[in-house]
């Protein structure tokens, strides 16, 4: 069912809307983590490192799918808040066709350029390259379904339905883990089995998402004849979505630069970085949930011309985000020995991973304050500012990491401490802009 976020107590609405998103993200991270544990336990640390060596690249393609979907979702949430159904349907139909076309293009690019991206751009160690290529090419072939699922989820959230995506991800997550066990543990297919399991689970979530959307929402029910791309509408979606896709991609490109630095330190570093990154993604669950919620909350309220309610919602959203994140960070610090044992790391990788897990638990609360404001920027239509902040954080983090890793004080720990330094500066710049209040005059719909 649709949900009107323009009426009621903001923090209660934010929590109610965000919890299904958080649960869905948790499921996604759990099956990613299960994927890693299964590969590491049944195929060894080299296979684990091979999957981890292309992780930042898979995140980049996911970022493009999420970014353009958010752009379409923001526009549609503002039309929904303004009760303009005809324009809403036009934008939704065009967004579906556009995203599926982009997904096909990304699949083609990923499969054809895999060797260049992994060997040249990321500097993947020669010993890992065959396995990494195999995994990534299979993953890239399924990108069209990832793009399809993300636009279906964005359209549903724009109408205030965040629960449906939880059910889609539940099915996808369970299927992924079961297929991992069948293909990797049962059939001994190694990294290829893990990649196939991921693609099949994405196909399932995409198909279920569109079927649910068609059945439950007349606003989002289209015949094949109605699914046409209006060029003017597509241009508007790209205009709004491009800054958000660029923002998501900039963050991911930062990880590409860092991945190259990680690969420089060899297999133990790659394995430990893979594990710590999986855990870091779990810490980000409440943060991303509140960020996505703030985008929809701000979009609907700006469509209803209620900017003061957006400000109130942001303050309350930050408190919710920070409280949940601190609990998870303390739990990670307490559980470091258990995490190390679960992934079967050797002594060298375990030593590195301990430091990384602790530092990420210290740094992530900074994100809990920044990302809700980032979601608000997306929702009110300030895509340029959100992109600028991401570019600022990327530039600072890469500079800090590459400069400080050469010093005796930091060494390889600069790879993760650079994160806290760069995002602290970005947070300050973001909130200076927020308190100036110029965003209150923005609107994406006329």
Language-model features, listed with the residues they occupy:
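Hydrophobic transmembrane alpha-helices of multi-pass small-molecule transporters
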Residues: 60, 176-181, 206-210, 282-285, ...
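Short alpha-helical transmembrane segments in multi-pass integral membrane proteins
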Residues: 1-18, 76-142, 186-242, 298-363, ...
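Short runs within selected transmembrane alpha-helices of multi-pass transporters and secretion channels
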Residues: 69, 138-157, 165-173, 194-207, ...
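Small-residue-rich hydrophobic transmembrane alpha-helices
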Residues: 48-108, 146-165, 272-336, 367-389
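Residue-level signal for short hydrophobic patches within transmembrane helices
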Residues: 11-30, 34, 57-64, 141, ...
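Transmembrane helical elements of multi-pass membrane transporters/channels
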Residues: 16-35, 138, 172, 201-205, ...
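Helix-terminus/linker motif at the lipid-water interface of multi-pass membrane proteins
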Residues: 26, 30-48, 118-126, 182-189, ...
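Small-residue hotspots at the loop-to-helix junctions and early N-terminal turns
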Residues: 43-56, 132, 136, 195, ...
């Amino acid at each position: 069912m649709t949900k009107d976020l323009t009426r009621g107590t903001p923090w209660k609405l934010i929590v109610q809307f965000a919890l299904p998103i958080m649960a869905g993200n948790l499921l996604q991270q759990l099956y990613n983590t299960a994927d890693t544990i299964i590969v590491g336990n049944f195929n060894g640390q080299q296979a684990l490192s091979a999957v981890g060596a292309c992780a930042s690249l898979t995140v980049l393609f996911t970022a493009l799918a999420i970014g353009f979907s958010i752009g379409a979702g923001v526009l549609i949430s503002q039309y929904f808040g303004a009760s303009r159904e005809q324009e809403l349907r036009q934008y939704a139909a065009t967004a579906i066709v556009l995203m599926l076309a982009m997904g096909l293009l990304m699949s083609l690019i990923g499969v054809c350029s895999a060797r260049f991206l992994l060997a040249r751009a990321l500097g993947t160690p020669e010993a890992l390259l065959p396995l990494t290529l195999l995994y990534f090419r299979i993953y890239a072939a399924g990108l069209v379904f990832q793009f399809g699922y993300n636009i279906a989820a964005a359209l549903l959230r724009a109408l205030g339905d965040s629960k449906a995506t939880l059910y889609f991800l539940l099915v996808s997550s369970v299927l992924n883990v079961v297929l991992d066990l069948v293909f990797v543990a049962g059939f001994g297919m190694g990294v290829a089995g893990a990649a196939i399991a991921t693609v099949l689970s994405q196909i399932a979530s995409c198909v279920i998402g569109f079927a649910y959307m068609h059945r439950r929402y007349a606003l989002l029910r289209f015949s094949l004849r109605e699914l046409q791309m209006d060029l003017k509408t597509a241009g508007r979606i790209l205009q709004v979505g491009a800054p958000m896709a660029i923002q998501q991609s900039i963050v991911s490109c930062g990880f590409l630069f860092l991945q190259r630095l990680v690969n420089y330190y060899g297999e133990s570093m790659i394995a430990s970085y893979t594990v710590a990154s999986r855990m870091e993604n779990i810490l980000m669950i409440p943060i991303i949930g509140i960020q996505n919620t703030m985008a929809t909350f701000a979009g609907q309220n700006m469509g209803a011309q209620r900017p003061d309610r957006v400000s109130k919602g942001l303050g309350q959203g930050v408190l919710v985000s920070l409280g949940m994140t601190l609990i998870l960070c303390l739990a990670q610090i307490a559980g470091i020995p258990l995490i190390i044992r679960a992934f079967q790391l050797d002594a060298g990788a375990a030593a590195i991973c301990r430091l990384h897990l602790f530092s990420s638990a210290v740094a992530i609360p900074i994100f809990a304050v920044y990302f809700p404001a980032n979601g608000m920027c997306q929702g009110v239509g300030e895509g340029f500012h959100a992109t600028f902040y991401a570019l600022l954080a990327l530039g600072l983090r890469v500079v800090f990491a590459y400069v400080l890793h050469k010093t005796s004080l930091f060494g390889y720990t600069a790879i993760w401490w650079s994160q806290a330094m760069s995002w602290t500066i970005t947070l300050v710049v973001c909130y200076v802009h927020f308190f100036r209040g110029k965003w209150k005059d923005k609107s994406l719909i006329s």
